[in-house]
Structure formats: structure tokens, C-alpha cells
Amino acid sequence: MRKKNFLNKVLQNTSCPQGFWGRMILRGMNCFHASLANRGMKQVEWQPNWNVLDIGCGGGANLKRLLNLCPKGNIYGIDLSEESVSFAQKYNEKDLNKRCFIQQGNVCSLPYEDGFFNAITAFETVYFWSPVDKALSEVARVLRKGGCFLISLEASDPELGKMWTERIDGMVVYTPAELEERLHEAGFSSIRTIRKKEEIHIIAYK
């Protein structure tokens, strides 16, 4: 049974940030996930006019990076957490509702038209998608034919990941093979995985 101590309560904000500790977590995400995001983004040949969706946009730092990578495109962010949406909107205030559009929503029911995006990103968030197969099918639905889906994760070993999954409700750590299989089932045809220790970047094309 999971201990209800203070640290575990704070860590619940990694999946759906709320309140003061949620905002602290979001600030930390913007800082400490930067190197992971940059390494992942280097695996994609970004085009200036792409429309890109970042799922689980958190504190909004990756939206700002995508705005720079696609200077003539539109960047969208979605997050289950109202706190995250508010934080990300403030972080990207300069471009908000011009080239940057951020809203609250669930990955299992994305509020976008079929084939709307050239690329979709997911940084440190797939752990919390439930049911994950439904979520991946939704990603495939809103991605254009030939579009790119980038997943970047710091954890890819379920056994080592127990230090987190035993503390954070609903968190699941997947192996690269598990994610690749689920991506194939969701309709992705070309999948490449880059792994360095436990960090993985999966680039999947529809």
C-alpha cells in the first residue's frame, strides 16, 4: 500500500499539477526537462511552417522551443491540468493566441480535426496516459499522413521505475519494445528508437 507521506503527495503533481506545489513542479519541469527535450527535438527535421501539438505541455517551455523551430507555423499545447494550462499561457504570453494556442483537454479525446498536425510531441507524459492505446490512437488520428510523433522519456525500465511508480498514482513505465508494439497497433508504420541508458526518444511516422 502506498504511503501517504508529504513527499508522495507532492509527487502526485507530476501527473496533474495543482495549486502551489503544482506550480513549483511546473517550474522544475521547465528547467530540468530542458536537456531531454533538446535531445529529442534534434531527432526531427523540423519545417518552418509546420503545425505542431505538444501533449502534456506542462509549464510551456517546450512550446516556446517549438515556436522557434517552426517560425511560420502554429504551435498547440494541451494538458489535463488547469494549473499547467494557466502556467504555460503566461510563459508564452507574447505568442499566445497568435501562433501559440493552449487549452485544457484529455489525450484520449483530442479536440482537433483528423490529420491536423504535421508533428506531435510528448515529453515525460506517456507514463500517465490511460488507457494508453486509446491515447495513441487519438494521436494517430490528428496526425497527418507522413507526420511525425516524438516521444521522449527519462524512464524506460519498469523495474528501475518502481522508485516512481510506487509513489505516483497511475504512473506506468513502459519498455521501448512495449511502446513500439503499441505504436504499430495504433497505425504508425515507421518507428525508430534512440536509447541511452534509461532515456529514450521514439520517432514514429504515420
Predicted regions and their residues:
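Class I SAM-dependent methyltransferase SAM/SAH-binding core
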Residues: 53-109
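A short SAM/SAH-binding and catalytic strip from SAM-dependent methyltransferases
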Residues: 119-131
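A short glycine-rich, Lys/Arg-flanked "PGG" loop and its adjoining helix->strand segment in the class I
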Residues: 133-145
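C-terminal alpha-helical "lid/dimerization" subdomain adjacent to the S-adenosyl-L-methionine
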Residues: 4-9, 17, 21-26, 30, ...
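A generic alpha-to-beta junction signature in SAM-dependent methyltransferases
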Residues: 44-46, 69-70, 96, 143
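Glycine-centered, small-residue-biased loops immediately flanking beta-strands
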Residues: 50, 73, 147
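A short acidic, Gly/Pro-enriched loop at the edge of an enzyme's catalytic core
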Residues: 108-119
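Conserved alpha-helix/loop element of class I SAM-dependent methyltransferases that forms part
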Residues: 31-50, 65
